[in-house]
Amino acid sequence: SYNNKELEDLILRGQSTDKLYKKLSRNKRFMFDLNKVMGILHSVSKISELYDLKSLHYEPLKYNLSGFSSVRIGYTSKYRLMFIEQEGGISIELINISEHYGDK
């Protein structure tokens, strides 16, 4: 499910009115990687499987982002997809795409 209408538009329609997402929607490599990540998230049966996919750099977040998790979008991308894991399976509530703090 989506907690962000602009993110939903980007993922489902490849377009958005949000400044960052609009810029990203024009990047073909990013959109390819985003679609690949979304396919992986839909295909795993439990969150623990994401640890096995090293290229995603899956991590539960800490400190002020505690309660959220993230995966990297693409191998060399500075962007990550943040989400909330739900109890009872792989139901994921997508929150946003952000620049990873360690990549400049």
Q: Where do the protein language model's features map onto the residues?
A:
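Arg/Lys-rich, positively charged N-terminal/basic patches that mediate binding to nucleic acids
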Residues: 1-39
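Enriched for short, Lys/Arg-rich terminal
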Residues: 62, 66-104
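Short, charged helix-to-loop "capping" segments that act as catalytic/coupling loops
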Residues: 12-17, 24-25, 52, 64-66, ...
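Residue-level marker of positions within ordered structural domains that often coincide
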Residues: 12, 46, 88
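A short, surface-exposed loop/turn module that caps and links secondary-structure elements
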Residues: 43-71
